[in-house]
Amino acid sequence: MTERRDNVSHAPDAIEGPNDGAHAEETSPGFFSFENLGVAQVQVVGGTLNGYVIGYVAVYLLLYLTATECKFTTEGACGGRKIYGCKWSGTTCKFENPKCSEGSDPSDSCKNEVAYTSVYSGIFACAMIVGSMVGSIIAGKCITTFGLKKSFIIVSITCTIACVVVQVAIEYNNYYALCTGRVLIGLGVGILCSVFPMYVNENAHPKLCKMDGVLFQVFTTLGIMLAAMLGLILDKTGASKEEANMAGRLHVFSAVPLGLSVAMFLVGMFLRESTATFAQDDDGKADGGMDPNEYGWGQMLWPLFMGAVTAGTLQLTGINAVMNYAPKITENLGMDPSLGNFLVMAWNFVTSLVAIPLASRFTMRQMFITCSFVASCMCLFLCGIPVFPGVAEEKVKNGVATTGIALFIAAFEFGVGSCFFVLAQDLFPPSFRPKGSSFVVMMQFIFNILINLLYPITTEAISGGATGDQDKGQAVVFILFGLIGLICFVLQFFYLYPYDANQDHENDHGTEPVERILSPVDVPTPRN
């Protein structure tokens, strides 16, 4: 058997002895101590950046719609934005395409000049996710090759370059450059989603590890809310939209992730080295630290499968459909798009805060499974069936659907989103976590791509086109979200368990790692 690190038994998911828990309780740092904040700071900056780039899509599409409507009332606002197909003619702002200016041509060629088509919107929404999927694939190799701290710096540099590309794309209204920038920032985010939770998992005190772990999702929701709040400010305040420089507002909105990327680089430069190290010699064997080749992919098939199921719960229950298309969804429910988007994201953040005290009282498994069941039921019985045309009256439908979305988001943030990145680590033994967590994160990005690309197209198609009743398509899609969530819930109820680090010694007597995992116990928390 390959030699293991001596301190593996002290990993955050290890089961403590009868006296270890009391000792840890007495000697552990406080949640707001400098020692703990020095570890948790990576969740703050990384989660906020992750959330902002997620919330970026809905706001950008809304601001871009305003920029391309050519309803500006001043020559400066209209004439200065020829890149959006607008020109000043006498006293009015018109489309450069004469057919559009006449207002009598209903052809698609004219309509497509306003905002993006559903296909272009879907591609734009999933561009970052494609990059994230690639980033998650290489994250494991990046961690074992460069270590956690250097990977942190690599992420910050990649995201900074991506933000510069986006700024250039906005200046020239280049859709393809914009998508390229989103792919690049997704590449950084894909690595980030494995590196940052792993750094906390390996370096936080055992008592605080799970509470620190859920901070990644908490600050992800904060980043999403910040994007929605800034979008509301840019859309509603200052000069009216008819007189404003919308391209300038898009530049301001896109400058925030650039600032966060630079801040991430500065944090990474002064971040202390991780206690977990991975090293290999030329023969692929460990020459120090943990051996990343200790477990093969075949030995981890069952944990990998359950990781994919948790990723399905995270993405295929529709959370990103709500996040990316919140303005359109809330508008269909009779609300102002930008205000509705902000209210959804603010509620998303507030509910995520509840996960911190819950993590000190319940296991990650208990939180994840319970909340996944509730979220799936909300999709099916409140967001889906009542919204279908003819099932309920308009006022009742809007009230029930709004309540359903609110409860769905609450259940998701209480346990599904907050526990996912912790479970992506806990499902695997420490030496396999670079590979295992990268795979799980990759799967959630694959599912994310499917949702972002197919949600607008499927909703529109089921509704009978852009002019059809959009409630029909939205209802059918949310019913599917609920059914998928319930299927995943059944699998998780019977088979989702964290890796049992306390049974490592069984391998010395011939028991294979996969056999150890089939009957594990839950990871304990300070109060459970």
UniProtKB/Swiss-Prot annotation:
Disulfide bridge positions per record: none
Listed GO CC annotations: cell tip; plasma membrane
Membrane topology, record value: Multi-pass membrane protein
PROSITE patterns: MFS
Superkingdom of source: Eukaryota
InterPro entries reported in the protein's UniProt record: GLUT, MFS_dom, MFS_sugar_transport-like, MFS_trans_sf, Sugar/inositol_transpt
Subcellular locations according to the entry: Membrane
Protein name according to UniProt: Glucose transporter 1E
Annotated source species: Trypanosoma brucei brucei
